[in-house]
Amino acid sequence: MSTDRRTAGILKKFFNLEVMAVQIYRTQVGALADPAERSMMVSAMKNEEHHRETFRSFLRARGISPSPQWPIYWLVGQVLGRITSLFGRRAVLRGDIAFEDKAAREYSAFLREGAFTEQERAFIGEFLEDEKKHSANWRNLL
């Protein structure tokens, strides 16, 4: 499948952002004392892992390697998760709302810009809704 540079770049960025999201959640779980809230965060993390692996499969299907910068996104996710965790539950939730809202804006913008297959477009639309749902969940906990 032929891929224009813009679409390839968007898919790589989506993958990188999902790598970061997984690490943010992974490092924040311990900051939540309530078992139900921790369970929600683990569920969100697993959802982001699904997004990451789906983007990995889209890249593979197009014969594209992930960006060599993905380890930087992994590290940034670790740092953001740990920093927000240092400031407690409210900081974790506020940070996650900001992260998820930004992800939703990027998904919306990239959907308009990329030349995606119908399958990719459907998944990306579903992932956009997931990001909005995560943000709403964290808002409800504040």
What are these regions (language model features)?
Residues 1-142:
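Non-heme di-metal
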